[in-house]
Amino acid sequence: MAGNIFGQMFRIATWGESHGRAVGVVVDGLPAGLPFSEADIQKELDRRRPGQSEVSTPRSEADRVEILSGIFEGMSTGTPISMLVWNSDARSSSYDVIKNTPRPGHADFSYMARYGIRDHRGGGRSSARETIGRVAGGALAKLLLSRYGVRIAGHVLELGGIRAKPLSFEEILENVEKTPVRCADLEAAEKMLEKVATLRQEGDSVGGIVELIVKGVPAGLGEPVFDRLDADLSKALMSIPAVKGFEIGAGFEAARMRGSEMNDPFRMEQGEITCSKNNAGGILGGISTGLDIICRAAVKPTPSIGKVQQTVDLTTRENTEISIRGRHDPTIPPRMVPVAEAMVALVLSDHMLRSGFINPRTLLE
């Protein structure tokens, strides 16, 4: 299976399966001289960890990270950094009943069609548990970006048709962790919680939209034409399990606008070139403009639901029915926020190294 490595100069390779012994990541390309510790990684993993609230799976995992290489006396050495998290609460027997019946909305059938074999225990490699490696690698990318004034804020913009009101970057940072749904509009968050609770009782699930806002990205970041910054952000977010759509700036609303409405007029402000609005989402021609990068990912409802669904028996080749039991998230967006932030951080770190905005030698000065 190829496709487990992401990035060019700042690269990650994730490994492991949902019910295997462990999951992890190898980070390659982090410059020498960046101070970090397991606590820096753990802080991000704790945000993604299951079993923390009524909107996440009851699977109980400590998700304690172990750093195996690439660090000496609390500082990166420039060599590959390997990180590991042990799986401790996998209940593989719960999946025996679906061994021969692909779950609607899951990758069971497509993995079998592609490889002729699949790990049916929790989805194996296609499980969202793979994203632990992304979050661990993204934690290092965030630390690197913070040295250059780049900050990322992710939040649940919409859940089950309930949309948050517009909030400032600082308001999002202040409020996003105050509620299990990670919606910075606390009034909308209460309605979202009620929606999730109702659907969970019905044996159903709900999707939503995760929004990412990035401040401090310099103008001139990106590599046209096939390595456009927005194209790489799209790939990064679309690679997350359950993401079915991506937009940046005005996004799909741009298709309904006139040019006079869509265009962002340039102007001088305190001696700097800026724009009076930001429909482009901080990127023009695949290159950053210096304005905030604003993008969103559409997340489908959790496919594992208690309702009876149609499927087929792979052994008998006959139609049958399936009802998913076990421990599953009733909604994905809240736990996806730190994953999405990590992927954005990985893209930006990679591009800043490629474009020369980060000089690997200066970290040691």
From Swiss-Prot:
<keyword id="KW-0057">Aromatic amino acid biosynthesis</keyword>
<comment type="similarity">
    <text>Belongs to the chorismate synthase family.</text>
</comment>
<keyword id="KW-0285">Flavoprotein</keyword>
<dbReference type="GO" id="GO:0010181">
    <property type="term" value="F:FMN binding"/>
</dbReference>
<dbReference type="InterPro" id="IPR000453">
    <property type="entry name" value="Chorismate_synth"/>
</dbReference>
<dbReference type="GO" id="GO:0004107">
    <property type="term" value="F:chorismate synthase activity"/>
</dbReference>
<feature type="region of interest" description="Disordered">
    <location>
        <begin position="41"/>
        <end position="62"/>
    </location>
</feature>
<dbReference type="Pfam" id="PF01264">
    <property type="entry name" value="Chorismate_synt"/>
</dbReference>
<feature type="binding site">
    <location>
        <position position="327"/>
    </location>
    <ligand>
        <name>FMN</name>
    </ligand>
</feature>
<keyword id="KW-0274">FAD</keyword>
<feature type="binding site">
    <location>
        <begin position="125"/>
        <end position="127"/>
    </location>
    <ligand>
        <name>FMN</name>
    </ligand>
</feature>
<dbReference type="InterPro" id="IPR020541">
    <property type="entry name" value="Chorismate_synthase_CS"/>
</dbReference>
<dbReference type="GO" id="GO:0008652">
    <property type="term" value="P:amino acid biosynthetic process"/>
</dbReference>
<protein>
    <recommendedName>
        <fullName>Chorismate synthase</fullName>
        <ecNumber>4.2.3.5</ecNumber>
    </recommendedName>
</protein>
<feature type="binding site">
    <location>
        <position position="285"/>
    </location>
    <ligand>
        <name>FMN</name>
    </ligand>
</feature>
<comment type="function">
    <text>This reaction introduces a second double bond into the aromatic ring system.</text>
</comment>
<dbReference type="GO" id="GO:0009423">
    <property type="term" value="P:chorismate biosynthetic process"/>
</dbReference>
<dbReference type="GO" id="GO:0009073">
    <property type="term" value="P:aromatic amino acid family biosynthetic process"/>
</dbReference>
<keyword id="KW-0028">Amino-acid biosynthesis</keyword>
<keyword id="KW-0521">NADP</keyword>
<dbReference type="GO" id="GO:0005829">
    <property type="term" value="C:cytosol"/>
</dbReference>
<feature type="binding site">
    <location>
        <position position="48"/>
    </location>
    <ligand>
        <name>NADP(+)</name>
    </ligand>
</feature>
<feature type="binding site">
    <location>
        <begin position="300"/>
        <end position="304"/>
    </location>
    <ligand>
        <name>FMN</name>
    </ligand>
</feature>
<dbReference type="InterPro" id="IPR035904">
    <property type="entry name" value="Chorismate_synth_AroC_sf"/>
</dbReference>
<comment type="pathway">
    <text>Metabolic intermediate biosynthesis; chorismate biosynthesis; chorismate from D-erythrose 4-phosphate and phosphoenolpyruvate: step 7/7.</text>
</comment>
<keyword id="KW-0288">FMN</keyword>
<feature type="compositionally biased region" description="Basic and acidic residues">
    <location>
        <begin position="41"/>
        <end position="51"/>
    </location>
</feature>
<keyword id="KW-0456">Lyase</keyword>
